[in-house]
Amino acid sequence: MTNSIGIHFNITFIGAGNVAWHLAPTLKDAGHHIVQVYSRTVESAEALATQVGAQAVNKYEDVEPTSHIYIYALTDDSLQWVMNHIKIRKGLHIHTAGSMPISIFKQVRDNYGCIYPLQTFTKEKRVDLRKVPFFIEANNKESETLINDIARCMSQKIYRLSSEDRKELHLASVFACNFSNLMYIYAEKRLGRKNIPFDVLHGLITESVNKVKKIGPRAALTGPARRGDNRILDQHISLLHKDPEWQEIYTLLSEQIKKM
């Protein structure tokens, strides 16, 4: 995506994980200059820095205080630690965490906010950010305008959301993405015991997602618990006798489905 705002910023990335691997190249392609990539692991910093033509640093004292924007693409635990060690007050400081309030910056930065891309990222699979929803927040109007401009270099879907509401969004995302993926992992494990390839479920998964998108999750819900088919439910619970934790999960989820 081209840089529609007509201004090029010097940007430093703090963190070189999955989120940084998507945001940094996209911002570079939009015309911004990625100055530095910091990671406590030098190999991680160098790998991303090479991709975006930046300097790699792995010591917090080597992070230059001259960038316009600092993007903290870190885990929640790492964010607090890094902020206490990289003591740069100038510039605009932006974290990308769904569950962290922007007030984490309050005592140590003057201008700050959040850009939260609602997507699951891995380095191995590049995501087209243009249709990924980005949720932004800032501590003042000037910072919000700048964060909005930066976000629009990456996505067409920008929303303003408070820290409290972003926590709810993050929680919902865990249910929709992480927990569903856990179910896929267990399904793969069960199939593997019988030498059945997981890809036999691909069509089912795709159709389920398509129906959810078209008619909504409640209307798309099917299966024995939805039908009240207790014979099948008892059969499944019996099959899970060697996995008591999953037997409990199956029972609990089935009871929740019955209440829908």
Where are the regions a protein language model picked out?
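NAD(P)+-binding Rossmann beta1-loop-alpha1 motif at the extreme N-terminus of oxidoreductases
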Residues: M1-V57, V127
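Interdomain hinge/lid region at the active-site interface
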Residues: T206-M260
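Internal alpha-helical scaffold of NAD(P)-dependent oxidoreductase catalytic cores
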Residues: S44, L48-Q51, N111, R126-E168, ...
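Amphipathic, non-transmembrane alpha-helical scaffold segments
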Residues: Y38, I71, S173-A176, S180, ...
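A structural micro-motif
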Residues: F9, H32-H33, A54-Q55, G91-L92, ...
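Phosphate- and divalent-cation-binding pockets in alpha/beta enzyme and binding domains
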Residues: H22, A47, W81-V82, I104, ...
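Rossmann-like NAD(P)(H) cofactor-binding subdomain of soluble oxidoreductases
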Residues: V42-E46, T50-R126
